[in-house]
UniProtKB/Swiss-Prot annotation:
InterPro entries: Ribosomal_uS8, Ribosomal_uS8_CS, Ribosomal_uS8_sf. GO terms for molecular function: rRNA binding; structural constituent of ribosome. It comes from Geobacter sulfurreducens (strain ATCC 51573 / DSM 12127 / PCA). Part of the 30S ribosomal subunit. Contacts proteins S5 and S12. Belongs to the universal ribosomal protein uS8 family. Keywords: Ribonucleoprotein, Ribosomal protein, RNA-binding, rRNA-binding. Signal peptide: none annotated. It comes from the Bacteria. One of its GO terms (cellular component) is cytosolic small ribosomal subunit. This is Small ribosomal subunit protein uS8. The gene is rpsH. One of the primary rRNA binding proteins, it binds directly to 16S rRNA central domain where it helps coordinate assembly of the platform of the 30S subunit.
Length: 132
């Protein structure tokens, strides 16, 4: 069965695993999802991730991060740009998430980067999601 929004599926799996206090969550892998996990790790929202090869597309295993082993580091993770309603911003209109406490992840010509990196580089793009 085809999936209309694989990024929303990934974010929902992470959100649900956080609420269930799971240590890890398995997600069908793709290059975009691996890049998104890389940004989440660099920003300190997840512990780690790894790609497990299988006979099909592979599995992205995301290790979740908690504060004092009980409270999730990710309070909210939200999809912004959706397949039916894309959200593009210029370099001067990049949103600030929770007054800088969270991050917006953008898909730009320089790859997936955070809102802060996009402002510094002076590039705009598609706002994939916000995390805080």
């Amino acid at each position: 069965m085809s999936m209309t929004d694989p990024i929303a599926d990934m974010l929902t799996r992470i959100r649900n695993a956080n609420m269930a206090r799971l240590q890890k969550v398995d997600i069908p892998s793709s290059n975009l999802k691996v890049n998104l996990a890389n940004v989440l790790k660099a920003e300190g929202f997840i512990k780690n991730y790894k790609v497990i090869a299988d006979s099909r597309q592979g599995v992205l295993r995301v290790y979740l991060k908690y504060i004092d082993e009980k409270d999730p580091v990710i309070n909210e993770i939200k999809r912004v740009s959706k397949p039916g309603s894309r959200v593009y911003v210029g370099s001067d209109k990049i949103p600030s998430v929770k007054n800088g406490m969270g991050v917006a992840i953008l898909s730009t010509s320089k790859g997936l980067i955070t809102d802060k990196s996009a402002r510094e580089a002076g590039v705009g793009g598609e706002v994939l999601c916000t995390v805080w």
